């Protein structure tokens, strides 16, 4: 577990070290250096000298835990001040066990499952000597932007909640039995020069950073390579990070700024060689204030203290204290748990899922059903295929490829001559089957390729009992032969346990509870579905919306009832829009959500408290300000299925929202917790 900060003992250690450190050693606390080739003795010896001289703070690219411990021993026992090292690495969606990709995980809306997944990732990273994860990378997917980068959702609030859950998992914030690793909140995908880089992007990054930092200590934060045009705006907006008693973690953009100032250059990337001697010279010439270097070095020392490195055991004591880590079986179970919660049932009318006795003979169509590398998307592998999952459950099925094989790693695109025979064979097999399950892989830009569309169109001429399962990044709800398919399950890239999760959902061993983290826009290719849409094997109804104004917050509530015949999980979502004069924006902003489990016939009142974080907006100076005005507040099961009303927020209540604390005894949140 990462030690919470601030801490008086930590400040004493940091203060004492800074008093003894030379300017060169302080600059060395900002130097991330690539590990040497173990076979190159000269390079390894030179690297060891740099550690002894205090010119290295972090080592990238270590090959094993033993190598990390060897470097750590040099730093602690042979350097002048014995300051330990960090070992950073990209952990992404898994080290040994591959978890669902960012957009797939976002569909779960389950922060506990995401935190548990990151705890496993931290354990596996720690077993390799890594103690600093260069993630999570926060991002959102606006309509029309494509899915070329990892994204959490199209709604900033969901992206912020997921980022906080990932940080808590990596840093083992809720589990004292785990070591944890430092996390780094990476906002570069939002603030990159290639993006629009405007005021809205900065406000979104502020909302994410503020939400994550409110949950507890954050090891580090990175803004990436903002260009000169946006750098001043960023520095002004995020100035709160530098204030006394504010953010305690490492600010990697400050390292870049110091390096660029010392080199007299426009821009320096994280991971570039840190010009230690140039920084020393710039400070001696008073081109860089020593206080800036002291602050940056102090943040690194605090991070190392929080990680427990100043009391790090070495040698035999380290082996004795390592204890037992979760086994691969437990890790895979955590991956399976999250993967099942990521599946989104887009359509099921008539109710063809779950598969059962009435499903009759099952025909599985699509080469993607056999693909063990598609679910991990090049992040490791292999994972479990859909066929693997069905066979483990003992489900009898027949198989047809549906389309001709493409070259290795080739994507399905236009029809080829061999497709005609494959489609014909699939249609003949479909005539002799009661239920057809079609499994498709990556679909470019969220639409069917020509060959895939022809396959589904041909199948629909011989049967209506088609279940479509999609494994691509983006969800799709295709229009085939003039209308939507009866049953569509979007799984996405679910990682190591993908096939087992999908098979359990298809057969009813588990129930779907995922929600769309991005809307499917309506077009000639897709019927279109709203953000937050996702069906269940149970049925839910939302009624009795109430909006109440208190002295310092707003309470919105509605009653959720399970009208189905089985238990289920529903995600109730809160949306807010603010009138701009007489204009009401078409886009609703997600501001909160709650997952609720109900038995058949059971009902529960779901309450949301809205204060400054929910109704406020970030200003250019980084302040979150709530203003009076007319708000449109909606509670729903998706952005397209809501109950809503307008409420006038007085200026006095808006000003008082800054002092409201959620969850105090007697508050709505406290009542919900006790219910």
Per-region residue spans from a language model:
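N-terminal beta-rich core of secreted/periplasmic extracellular enzymes
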Residues: 1-186, 201-272, 280-309, 335-351, ...
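C-terminal non-catalytic regions of proteins with extracellular/luminal or membrane-system context
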Residues: 1-8, 41, 127, 199-212, ...
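Alpha-helix boundary/capping detector
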Residues: 43-44, 85, 151, 326-329, ...
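Feature marks short, surface-exposed loop/turn motifs that line or immediately flank catalytic pockets
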Residues: 95, 141, 191, 371, ...
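Short, contiguous strand/loop micro-motifs
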Residues: 107-109, 196, 266, 326, ...
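Eukaryotic compositionally biased low-complexity/IDR segments
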Residues: 188, 194-199
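Short helix-loop capping/hinge segments that flank enzyme active sites or metal/cofactor-binding pockets
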Residues: 299, 307-313, 317, 440
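Flexible, acidic loop-helix segments that line cofactor/substrate-binding pockets
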Residues: 311-329
